[in-house]
Amino acid sequence: MINILFAGHQQRWDEYQAPLDEALTDRGLEFSLLPSCPPEEVDYIVYDPSGPLEDFTPYSRCQAVMGLWAGVENVVDNSTLSAPLTRMVDQNLTRGMVEWVVGHSLRHHLGMDRHLFGQDGIWRSEITPLAADRPITILGMGALGRACAEALADLGFPVTGWSRTRKRITGVEMYCGERWFNNALK
């Protein structure tokens, strides 16, 4: 029996319990998924970064911590975390991130804030450069970075990507490793 602790607020538990139960059952796993469990019996933790869990020390048997969100910046430096940290990436998360990145890239590219907030009654004729003349760099080319880079490249932006490890992505000029970080920013 695999003991999985859901470490998050009640609202998140209500939202995630059924989908997690279904996904684990579909994979034929024998598991116990609970919002509380004695720390010494926990095999895995499903971690809500906004939840109350801050000290991972008592979870000595824990084999991995899976974050519910793509961002891990609030837990990656937690000195009590000794188990491997994974993050959840699914189709909807990826799609949402692509929409957000493309939306804000276009917002800045087209100068939408000037149009929305510059309502002083004075007409200003501004010619926006084509996407092909506006390079974009994405730092981090994991599942989310890659999807965003591909979407921006499909819109005609020249996209540069940087990753810690070597990757090949069609339509994206890639740099990898610390040595090439500054080149990606040029």
Predicted regions and their residues:
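N-terminal glycine-/charge-rich "phosphate-binding" loop or analogous flexible N-terminal tail
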Residues: M1-D43
